[in-house]
């Protein structure tokens, strides 16, 4: 029975959730991977895909990083003896060197730390990809939209030229 479940988890998608808004609102200079400190009911809810990263961010407190604003909806059948708080702040598991680097950049240069995606690593560990970057201004967003539209138009033109 265990072998069936192991095969099923290997074949299933490793991605759990993506923060699509993050790439639109921020220009990332650096990305890194962090572990998450979770409770049992949270892991069960994540396996069922009940995660929302859209309004979440990472903040530093006492030299440690915490994920705030990430909603993990509790399952009805999960835990009856523990009070489930879907919006609690969750500790990120990073090395001291990484934490010091993040703290320095956030304090001095005005960078923000934003979660980009959440995924399974080796089928058992929940990891989160965080990005260190600055917020885009309105004209930066317009430039990105123009570039994207130009790339689409260029691809259409090339496709028509190849077909003729």
Swiss-Prot record:
Principal location listed in the UniProt entry: cytoplasm
Annotated Gene Ontology cellular component terms: cytosol
SUPFAM superfamilies hit by this protein: Small protein B (SmpB)
Regions annotated as coiled coil: none
GO function term, MF aspect, one: RNA binding
Family, similarity comment: Belongs to the SmpB family.
General function of this protein: Required for rescue of stalled ribosomes mediated by trans-translation. Binds to transfer-messenger RNA (tmRNA), required for stable association of tmRNA with ribosomes. tmRNA and SmpB together mimic tRNA shape, replacing the anticodon stem-loop with SmpB. tmRNA is encoded by the ssrA gene; the 2 termini fold to resemble tRNA(Ala) and it encodes a 'tag peptide', a short internal open reading frame. During trans-translation Ala-aminoacylated tmRNA acts like a tRNA, entering the A-site of stalled ribosomes, displacing the stalled mRNA.
Name under which the protein is recorded: SsrA-binding protein
Organism: Shewanella sediminis (strain HAW-EB3)
């Amino acid at each position: 029975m265990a072998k069936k479940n192991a095969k099923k988890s290997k074949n299933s998608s490793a991605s759990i959730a993506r923060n699509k808004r993050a790439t639109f609102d921020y220009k990332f200079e650096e990305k890194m991977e962090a572990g998450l400190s979770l409770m049992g009911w949270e892991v069960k809810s994540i396996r069922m895909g009940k995660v929302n990263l859209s309004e979440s961010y990472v903040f530093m407190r006492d030299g440690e990083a915490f994920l705030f604003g990430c909603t993990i909806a509790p399952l009805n059948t999960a835990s009856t003896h523990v009070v489930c708080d879907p919006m609690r702040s969750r500790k990120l598991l990073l090395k001291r060197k990484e934490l010091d680097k993040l703290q320095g950049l956030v304090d001095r240069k005005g960078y923000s730390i934003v979660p980009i995606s959440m995924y399974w690593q080796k089928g058992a560990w929940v990891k989160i990809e965080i990005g260190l970057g600055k917020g885009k201004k309105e004209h930066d967003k317009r430039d990105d939209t123009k570039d994207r539209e130009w790339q689409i138009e260029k691809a259409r033109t090339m496709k028509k030229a190849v077909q003729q």
